[in-house]
């Protein structure tokens, strides 16, 4: 372990000695005027696109009391890709699973009968 530590210290010393001294970089100076644009007021909040026309976007509504975190910038509906299935969908799913299990069982029986010798 001492050999590894000594090798590491020697390598760092050698690397530091081989690098020429450079003057420190000049200090950062803040710009005289702000470089950004202020946000437009709420009624003229636009969504930008590659097309030359602009479409106004609706403003966000106030969040309800039990909500947490950010309410989001716009009030568009969020698509739900996975929802809770209704009772009919669950019954169809169970029927399909049952039919698949029955077909698999019948295939197994058919192969067992074909394999028997009389």
Swiss-Prot record:
GO terms for biological process: vitelline membrane formation involved in chorion-containing eggshell formation. Residues 1-17 form the signal peptide. One of its GO terms (molecular function) is structural constituent of vitelline membrane. InterPro entries: Vitelline_membr_Cys-rich-dom. It comes from the Eukaryota. Its main location: secreted. One of its GO terms (cellular component) is extracellular space. Pfam families: Vitelline_membr. It is found in: Secreted. Major early eggshell protein. Belongs to the vitelline membrane family. This is Vitelline membrane protein Vm32E. It comes from Drosophila mauritiana (Fruit fly).
């Amino acid at each position: 372990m001492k050999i590894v530590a000594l090798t590491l210290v020697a390598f760092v010393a050698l690397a530091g000695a081989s690098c020429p001294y450079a003057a420190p970089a000049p200090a950062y100076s803040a710009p005289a005027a702000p470089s950004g644009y202020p946000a437009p007021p709420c009624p003229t909040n636009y969504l930008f696109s590659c097309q030359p026309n602009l479409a106004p976007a609706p403003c966000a509504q106030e969040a309800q009391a039990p909500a947490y975190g950010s309410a989001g910038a716009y009030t568009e509906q969020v698509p739900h890709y996975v929802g809770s299935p209704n009772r009919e969908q669950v019954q169809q799913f169970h029927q399909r699973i049952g039919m698949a299990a029955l077909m698999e069982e019948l295939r197994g029986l058919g192969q067992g009968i074909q394999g028997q010798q009389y």
